[in-house]
Structure formats: C-alpha cells, structure tokens
C-alpha cells in the first residue's frame, strides 16, 4: 500500500524484510527484443483483454476475489460457486481478468463501460444487477500455498493445461468463466501475425508466454506484452483547473512515475462529464492509466511522455510504474 510518507512498501521491506505483508502478483514485462529473443518456442500467444485483473482465491471450500494489489472485490455472490466447483477439493488461486457482458449482448463491453462497473465492485458499491453481468477470463492456476510463498516451479504449460481441462468441464449454458483465447505459436513471426490480427479487430494485443516459465511474485521475463499503443500507470501528484469554458472543471492532471523520474501533464482523454466529476474529487495520490506514443525529454530535460492521453483511474492499484518499466 501507499504509506503516504514518501516511501512505498517495497522500500520499507528492503530495510526490514517482511515488515509489511505484500500481496503476491506476477506481472508481464513490456516488449523488449532481448526478452523476446529468450522465449522458447513453441510458446503461447494469448489475447490481451481489457478488463480488471483479479484473483479468485478458493480455500477451505470458500471463494473470495482480490484485485492485483490484494483489495477485496465484492461481486455479491456472483461467480463464487462456479470457482468453488472448478477448484474441487484443492486450495488454489485462479489468475485472470473480470469483464462485463451487458444483457442481451454476446460480447464483452468496451473498457470504459466495463471497468466503470468493475470499479464499483472494487469500491464495494456495485449493485446485484451489475454484479450479475460480471464474467471472468482466466489464464493461470496456482496452488494456494505456493501463491502465498510467491513461487510455483511448475511450468506454465502444465499449469495452463490443467486450467484448460477443468474450465472445459463447465456446462455451456449460462457459463461465465472462460479460458483466455490462446494459440500455440512455433515462431515469433506467427506471434506477430496473431498480434496484428487482433489489433485489426480492435483488441489490445497479445501476451507471449514461454511454456517453461514458472510463476513468481515479480515481473516475469517469460511473459511479454505486445501492444499497439504504449501504456503506463502513473501517480497523480497535482491537478489543474480548466480555462475558458472549462473553468470550474478539471483541466489536467500532473503525473509522475513511482520514482518521480518520468513527469507529465495529461490534459486530453477526458469528456466533459469526467472533467466536472473529477474536479469535485480528490485525485491526488490516485493511480491513473495513461496511453502515449513514446518516452521523451521535455524542454527542461526531464523524462516525459509524448502525446499522453487519459484512459482511466486505476482503483485496483496503489503503486505507479517505475521509470525503468516505462519504455
């Protein structure tokens, strides 16, 4: 969590190991050719979804949902029995994303609509009707004890194969849990073709995963993000009021990376309703998702971002990306 005193949890724990419990979470690495070159083929090219990262933790026959930072996600009973049934008698953790399927639709809602509802689950304000719209796509399965330990040595190919088998046993009628769309690729060229195909269809991209990769509580070098646009999560350190017709509304947010090295003002991407609403709220210290074209030096010689655009407030995160993870 953010300690509100100029240091984060990881810094405190470097001084006194284990002082503050940290929630386990394996992250993907942003695209770097040197990392991609180390991927062993055949590998998995999996569709990158636009939902909310979550864990379904099944223990002692009960299920709870947590965000990537360990905050409880309230779904008012939705999906609990489904995950308990999938787990059987095993204590385990399902890793994936929550998505929203609106009534009458046969496809998932767009990111803004879906995450608007999912953020309510994160805040504990979701209604039963909204919770019933939530579905899950999953891509990993980790034994509970190894999840808590922060390391599972079983290769991803074995973990995912087990997950595929148990998810496939669900009845087709009314199912709400799905395996992530996944393709086994023999070469990097095949992965790039799938990536370009998804972009053309309006999806975000792929995660390329090495089948030999272990699960570990850190940023993995065996799971690589391929994205059409660059994206990062920054901390809001200040806000600016709009000018002219935008007086009395949010004009821009001033953001920084976790280490304060990357700094940028983000003024585009907000609609009028958001500008009015956010000006009433205390946005300072919140985490925000920003898309951009490239990392640059500004006129003052500081690291910044070219063409930054607001995407959403990340209520599921407490800590921004470090500058080394912003390409």
Q: What residue spans do the PLM features occupy?
A:
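Amphipathic alpha-helical
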Residues: 7-26, 178-230
């Amino acid at each position: 969590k953010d300690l509100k005193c100029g240091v984060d949890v990881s810094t405190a724990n470097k001084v006194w190991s284990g002082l503050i419990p940290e929630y386990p979470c394996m992250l993907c690495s942003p695209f770097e050719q040197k990392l991609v070159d180390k991927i062993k083929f055949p590998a998995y090219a999996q569709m990158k979804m636009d939902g909310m990262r979550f864990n379904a933790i099944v223990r002692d026959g009960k299920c709870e949902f947590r965000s990537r930072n360990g905050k409880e996600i309230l779904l008012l009973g939705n999906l609990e029995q489904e995950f308990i049934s999938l787990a059987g008698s095993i204590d385990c953790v399902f890793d994936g994303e929550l998505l929203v399927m609106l009534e009458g639709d046969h496809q998932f809602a767009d990111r803004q609509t879906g995450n608007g509802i999912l953020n309510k689950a994160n805040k504990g304000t979701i209604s039963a009707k909204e919770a019933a719209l939530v579905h899950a796509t999953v891509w990993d399965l980790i034994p509970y004890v190894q999840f808590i330990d922060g390391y599972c040595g079983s290769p991803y190919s074995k973990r995912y194969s087990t997950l595929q088998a148990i998810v496939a046993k669900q009845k087709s009628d009314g199912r709400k849990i799905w395996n992530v769309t996944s393709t086994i690729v023999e070469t990097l060229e095949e992965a790039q073709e799938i990536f370009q195909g998804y972009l053309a269809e309006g999806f975000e991209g792929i995660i390329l995963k090495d089948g030999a990769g272990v699960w570990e509580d850190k940023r993995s070098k065996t799971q690589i993000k391929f994205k059409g646009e660059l994206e990062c999560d920054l901390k809001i350190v200040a806000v600016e009021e709009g000018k002219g017709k935008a007086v009395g509304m949010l004009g821009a947010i001033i953001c920084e990376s976790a280490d304060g090295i990357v700094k940028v003002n983000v003024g585009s991407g907000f609609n009028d309703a958001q500008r009015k609403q956010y000006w009433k709220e205390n946005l300072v210290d919140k985490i925000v998702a920003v898309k951009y074209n490239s990392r640059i030096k500004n006129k003052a010689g500081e690291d910044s971002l070219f063409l930054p655009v607001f995407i959403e407030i990340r209520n599921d995160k407490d800590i921004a990306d470090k500058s080394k993870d912003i390409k």
